[in-house]
């Protein structure tokens, strides 16, 4: 018995993507073929989705705000949207965590923004704090300079206070020696002590120096320019105070003595250095019976204020001549008015009365100087006048040594009051008398008085007793310096700074006559007013 085994034939199966016929069976139709891999698809959507895998196109995008995912299939997009729509989406692990991280990221972004704002605010605050801290640092750097400035300021204030106290004590000492008008002068002296600093510095300097070095000439001239600009603002105050002093002293002088005299106004040294006080001469009372052109007041009472002259330091080309000539033209000077001696005690007045130069009261009439303080060609020559022409000279050698000693110049200036006190020690033989013109002169062998033309005549009285003492010493002392008289007065520079009419302040005895009277009687056509420094000691010779 033999049997044959016939194997079973397997049915042919269709492989995906291939229209292969197996065992004569034809697979279903796949009309949609992939152009890239030649794969066939039953539907067009499947072919399109397959082609997107080759091209990488993802047309389906998530429209949730903040989500930028895109998908190639629509079903993937719908599944993705579930994540955004549901709070707890189902699906794979990590989706829940991923959604939480997205929310946290948003919160973190908000926190970062807040932190940035806070940082900006902190930076601004730090910048402001740094700016405030820079200012104290700069102040600390400049603190030493400020301390040094404070020390300098305190030193200046202390020095000013010391000088102010010295000035007050000086004024109180000078007021104790004054006459009955010291009560009114004490208040004015206090006002003098509180004037401005430039005026005090200028007042502390002497009006004239005796025999200084040649090197001081340049410094004096530069000081003149620097001080003059400051003196212009403060000069009016000084003039008003001098006018007030003049008015207060005038009333007391008229009660005590009817004759005009001069008073020294010793301005206190307001600086710490030992500089001598300046001397200014102010007429105490106007001349009785003078016209409108006479007297320092000139009818308005402001003459003394407007006629305040200022003597500046002088070079030393001719120290003896300049000093003694200045003292000569300032005679007679007295610090305290004294009653005049009677006419009977002066034998020379009897001789003067015989010539007709005495008034009804027995006093000698004085001759006022010209405004120009110079002889207008009518003065007698030295040979004609003799020793009586020099009416103002010193006789005390100690006084002249003080004037010419450099050490005494540097320490303190020689005041005229000191010289007059030393004159009182002279013997009675050296006393001089008053001539018919009211001017003192030394006794000489020739008894012929000096007479000037009527053009220079003036009317008034003078203190004869003080004139004798002062002028006697000056007359004897000028003999030692006559060898310098040959030099011309024009060679010297004018160092005398005058105001508009300073001659009425510094003129002894009386004020000068008016220019109208002088021009009508004098032979000169024009009258110039040279300074006091430019005058010679001896009168010029007549030609």
Curated annotation (Swiss-Prot):
Protein's job: Involved in glucose repression of glucose metabolism genes.
Pfam families referenced in this protein's UniProt entry, alphabetically: zf-C2H2 (PF00096)
Residue spans of biased composition, Polar residues class: 224-233, 446-458, 498-525
Stretch list, region Disordered: 1-28, 73-102, 167-187, 212-233, 292-318, 437-464, 482-525
Biased composition (Low complexity): 303-313
Biased composition (Basic and acidic residues): 73-89, 484-495
InterPro entries cross-referenced by the UniProt entry: creA/MIG_C2H2-ZnF, Znf_C2H2_sf, Znf_C2H2_type
Gene Ontology annotations of biological process type: carbon catabolite repression of transcription from RNA polymerase II promoter by glucose
PROSITE patterns listed in its UniProt record: ZINC_FINGER_C2H2_1, ZINC_FINGER_C2H2_2
Source organism of this protein record: Kluyveromyces marxianus
Family of the protein in this entry: Belongs to the creA/MIG C2H2-type zinc-finger protein family.
Entry-linked SMART domains: ZnF_C2H2
Keyword annotations from UniProtKB, A to Z: Carbohydrate metabolism, DNA-binding, Metal-binding, Nucleus, Repeat, Repressor, Transcription, Transcription regulation, Zinc, Zinc-finger
Source species taxonomy: Eukaryota, Fungi, Dikarya, Ascomycota, Saccharomycotina
Locations listed in the record: Nucleus
Zn finger residue spans: C2H2-type: 32-54, 60-84
Protein name: Regulatory protein MIG1
């Amino acid at each position: 018995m033999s049997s044959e085994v016939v194997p079973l034939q397997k049915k042919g199966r269709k492989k995906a993507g291939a229209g292969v016929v197996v065992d004569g069976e034809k697979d279903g139709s796949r009309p949609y073929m992939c152009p890239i891999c030649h794969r066939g698809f039953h539907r067009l959507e499947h072919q399109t989705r397959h082609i997107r895998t080759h091209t990488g196109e993802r047309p389906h995008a998530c429209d949730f705000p903040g989500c930028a995912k895109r998908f190639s299939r629509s079903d993937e997009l719908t599944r993705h949207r579930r994540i955004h729509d549901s709070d707890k989406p189902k699906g794979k692990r990590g989706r829940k965590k991923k959604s939480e991280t997205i929310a946290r990221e948003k919160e973190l972004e908000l926190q970062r923004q807040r932190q940035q704002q806070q940082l900006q605010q902190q930076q601004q605050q730090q910048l402001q704090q740094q700016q405030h801290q820079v200012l104290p640092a700069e102040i600390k750097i400049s603190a030493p300079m400020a301390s040094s400035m404070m020390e300098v300021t305190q030193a200046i204030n202390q020095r000013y206070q010391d000088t102010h106290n010295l000035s007050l004590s000086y004024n109180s000492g000078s007021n104790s020696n004054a006459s009955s008008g010291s009560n009114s002068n004490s208040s004015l002296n206090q006002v003098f002590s509180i004037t401005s600093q430039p005026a005090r510095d200028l007042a502390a300097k002497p009006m004239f120096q005796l025999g200084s070095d040649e090197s001081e000439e340049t410094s004096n001239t530069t000081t003149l320019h620097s001080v003059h600009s400051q003196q212009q603002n403060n000069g009016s105050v000084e003039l008003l105070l001098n006018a007030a002093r003049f008015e207060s002293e005038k009333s007391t002088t008229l009660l005590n003595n009817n004759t005009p005299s001069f008073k020294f106004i010793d301005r206190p040294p307001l600086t710490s250095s030992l500089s001598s006080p300046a001397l200014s001469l102010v007429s105490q009372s106007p001349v009785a019976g003078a016209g409108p052109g006479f007297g320092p007041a000139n009818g308005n009472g402001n003459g003394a204020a407007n006629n305040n002259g200022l003597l500046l330091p002088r070079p030393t080309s001719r120290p003896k001549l300049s000093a003694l000539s200045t003292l000569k033209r300032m005679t007679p000077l007295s610090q305290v008015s004294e009653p005049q001696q009677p006419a009977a005690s002066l034998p020379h007045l009897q001789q003067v009365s015989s010539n007709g130069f005495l008034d009804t009261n027995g006093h000698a009439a004085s001759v006022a100087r010209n405004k120009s303080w110079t002889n207008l060609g009518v003065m007698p020559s030295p040979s004609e006048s003799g020793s009586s022409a020099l009416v103002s000279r010193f006789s005390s050698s100690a006084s002249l040594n003080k004037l010419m000693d450099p050490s005494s110049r540097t320490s303190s200036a020689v005041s005229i009051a000191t010289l007059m006190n030393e004159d009182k020690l002279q013997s009675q033989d050296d006393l001089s008398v008053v001539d018919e013109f009211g001017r003192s002169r030394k006794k000489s062998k020739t008894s012929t008085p000096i007479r000037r033309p009527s053009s220079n005549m003036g009317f008034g009285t003078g203190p004869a007793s003080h004139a004798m003492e002062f002028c006697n010493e000056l007359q004897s002392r000028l003999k030692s310096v006559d060898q310098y008289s040959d030099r011309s007065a024009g060679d010297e520079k004018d160092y005398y700074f005058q105001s508009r009419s300073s001659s009425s302040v510094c003129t002894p005895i009386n004020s000068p006559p008016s220019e109208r009277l002088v021009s009508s009687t004098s032979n000169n056509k024009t009258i110039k007013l040279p300074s006091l420094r430019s005058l010679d000691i001896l009168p010029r010779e007549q030609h």
